[in-house]
Amino acid sequence: CNFNLSKRIKPRKQKAKLGEYSTFLEKEIFEQADCIRDSTRGRFSKDYSSVVFGGIDTNKEIKRVVFLGCGTAYHAGLLGKYYMENIAGIPASVEISSEYRYKNNPTEDGTLVVAISQSGETIDTLFAVREAQDKGVDTIAITNTVMSSIARQVEEGIYQRVGQEVSVASTKAFTSQVTLILMLAVLLGRKNKLSAIESKEYIKQIRYLPKLVGDTLELCKESIKKTAVASSLTPSCTFLGRQYMYPIAIEGALKLKELCYISTHGYPTGELKHGPIAHMCPMYF
């Protein structure tokens, strides 16, 4: 959708309800399947062969993509880098918003900056967007708040549609961001190396995601409880992942750090032997 609306609107205050859940975090975790469904609804062509984002100009030639984000949004951007390079065949990088402002960022024709922010009010990301625009770079945003500061700052945007997220530890917003970035990679890939058949297969898998996520959450309920008990006494925890799972590993480390206030780390699997293994101990998880 195009965020640059000419009229002012008064935001509606919504009071979130717990329903059957004991915490908002639990509620939002189990809303992920529906949120992915809402984020993707109406954004495919009638024959499901291509992605359609109404507010994105698909006529521009994109030669490079730069993702901007902080915290969880930065981790979504890390996944976006893999998607853009492996699916769309477009060189990509990801920058921590607070660092981007103070770097000498080379620009070239065909560069697209994608700002990721659930609230649309992340000040470091807003300033990073302005920095990119000052250099003449095209900018879009992936945000959950249409009339937010970032949404109004960028030229174009993609609205997440996940509803209010109350918990400090982002869950459903993250899965929505990752899904929309994957769809963006498929969209840009069709202008590059991705065939119609390949695009259709990716879209088929994306449409299956809500069921897959819902089924996985139901299946893992008991095993998650057992894992939580087993790890509750550990003083520290390390998450490992390779390729697409590396951003998930550091996102998992951030989640445990935010929620349990223990020391956590995330590394590429192959890096374990290059230093991190030194602080492993029997109480380590």
Task: Briefly describe each language-model feature range.
Residues 26, 115, 239:
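Short, flexible active-site loop motifs that bind/organize anionic cofactors or intermediates
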Residues 1-33, 37-38:
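Intein/HINT protein-splicing elements and their conserved insertion hotspots or analogous self-processing inserts
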Residues 2, 73-75, 245-247:
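Short, acidic Gly/Pro/Ser/Thr-rich loop/turn segments
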Residues 31-36, 40-66, 156-285:
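Active-site phosphate/pyrophosphate-binding segments
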Residues 5-7, 79-80, 127-128, 251-252, ...:
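Composition- and surface-driven signal marking solvent-exposed, interaction-prone regions
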Residues 27, 75, 274:
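Histidine-centered active-site/metal-ligand motif
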Residues 60-208, 242, 281-282:
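Glycine-rich phosphate-binding loops that contact phosphosugars or nucleotide phosphates
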Residues 4-7, 15, 29, 44-46, ...:
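A short linear-motif detector with a strong N-terminal bias
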